[in-house]
Amino acid sequence: MAILKDTIIRYANARYATASGTSTATAASVSAASCPNLPLLLQKRRAIASAKSKNPNLVKRELQAHHSAISEYNNDQLDHYFRLSHTERPLYNLTNFNSQPQVNPKMRFLIFDFIMYCHTRLNLSTSTLFLTFTILDKYSSRFIIKSYNYQLLSLTALWISSKFWDSKNRMATLKVLQNLCCNQYSIKQFTTMEMHLFKSLDWSICQSATFDSYIDIFLFQSTSPLSPGVVLSAPLEAFIQQKLALLNNAAGTAINKSSSSQGPSLNINEIKLGAIMLCELASFNLELSFKYDRSLIALGAINLIKLSLNYYNSNLWENINLALEENCQDLDIKLSEISNTLLDIAMDQNSFPSSFKSKYLNSNKTSLAKSLLDALQNYCIQLKLEEFYRSQELETMYNTIFAQSFDSDSLTCVYSNATTPKSATVSSAATDYFSDHTHLRRLTKDSISPPFAFTPTSSSSSPSPFNSPYKTSSSMTTPDSASHHSHSGSFSSTQNSFKRSLSIPQNSSIFWPSPLTPTTPSLMSNRKLLQNLSVRSKRLFPVRPMATAHPCSAPTQLKKRSTSSVDCDFNDSSNLKKTR
């Protein structure tokens, strides 16, 4: 009986052990099957997303859904950007930056160029680049920067910005940052500088409205304007909303709308790319970065790109200066200054940062960025041409101004004798008036109004066929120009009456361009001639041409340089020796 009982217990234990082993193996297999292959799933998810992004209809529907979803909150978002701008505006101080003992504007340009290289190489977002520039400008306005820590500071700012804006797979790692600086800084130095930046900027380092944020919201507002019930009390916000309301109707064009009888449509992606390019160039400019609000710079870039594309693609011309001079407000003046500065920066491609050239001006000859820069250059040339033609309006106002300025008393003063000839006209009176050099003593510098433009003289008193249709002009002439006109019977006019003291620019160069001919517009496309129109010098009267030596005279012997240690004549090539 005991043997039977022992056999039953052993059999039961064996069955229990078999069952427990089977259940354990089953649980292990189930757990192994339940754990997914994360790298494989990530690869599949990216492949699906890449395939969907190539479907234009799906992308268009997604953009429409996004547009309708955020239309309810766009006003709140814009108001949030303005509040951030007002909060961080006092943090930018150009005087403090210029007071840096070891950092100057050239070093800032080089550091920004280096950061843009790193940003392009890592393929980071546009917001990351602008936030990095913002962090560097904020810190340099409040704290002294050592020259040997400037690169560490810039790379740390790029690291923080990438962690804030970019996805985790694109975020710059510490190993990558060390490779970018050739292992000049350790990982501990990067982490220490990161903590120092957060503490120095009160832990609100990323709360900034960047250029691309303003560009996105402005373009969105131009296609979906504010409702009539929204009222903005601040002058800057009201001014920007007014310009955004006019932006979509300027020059008879619309943004992202079908072409109509009023004019063609513009691609919003081209405007965004061009505005971002101008804002990137503006970030390298010290005056624009510290002096003007970022919202105004973004608005000026959008407006400038839109007008340039209108003229480049559809030949629709609109003068940006005339459009802004109509209101004569402070914000209009600032916007005009920003637009002209951006045009000057876009014209000088030789001064572009090397990182900007490698990013946009690559070997591809048909890139969109190059066409946008060509549009800006054509617009700038046409703008300077129109300003040049506007200066020709002085010739049509000669007789009117002199007839109002020289009355009978002035004529009696000029012709003091009793036998004043009847043929004495206003032109002769003006000639004698300018020939009297005592009037030059009353010249004041207060009434000088730049820009100063000189007009070419005409061989006859009839108006030129190339006169501008404009009715006003702010240009002035000099006594030399008046005496020159006395031989041809036509005189230039001034802004004020000649009964007042004359206002002659003291710091301007007298430049007489060639007479207007049908080939003048093609000749004026030369950049050097356009630059010479605005060149100023300290001489009041034109410099006499240098007298050439007589052909029979002996050649002039050149003296050796003061820094030269070789006792030889530079005209004699036999005395020259090779030096290291």
From Swiss-Prot:
Keywords: Cell cycle, Cell division, Cyclin
Function, as annotated: Essential for the control of the cell cycle at the G1/S (start) transition. CLN3 may be an upstream activator of the G1 cyclins which directly catalyze start.
Induction / repression: Not significantly cell cycle regulated.
GO CC, alphabetical: cyclin-dependent protein kinase holoenzyme complex; cytoplasm; nucleus
Pfam families linked: Cyclin_N (PF00134)
InterPro entries: Cyclin, Cyclin-like_dom, Cyclin-like_sf, Cyclin_N, Cyclins_cyclin-box
Family to which this protein belongs: Belongs to the cyclin family.
Ranges of Polar residues composition bias in the record: 470-480, 563-580
Xref: SMART domains: CYCLIN (SM00385)
GO-annotated biological processes: cell division; G1/S transition of mitotic cell cycle; regulation of cell cycle G1/S phase transition; regulation of transcription by RNA polymerase II; traversing start control point of mitotic cell cycle; vacuole fusion, non-autophagic; vacuole organization
Region of interest: Disordered: 454-498, 546-580
Protein name as annotated: G1/S-specific cyclin CLN3
Annotated gene: CLN3
An example Gene Ontology molecular-function term: cyclin-dependent protein serine/threonine kinase regulator activity
Biased composition (Low complexity): 454-469
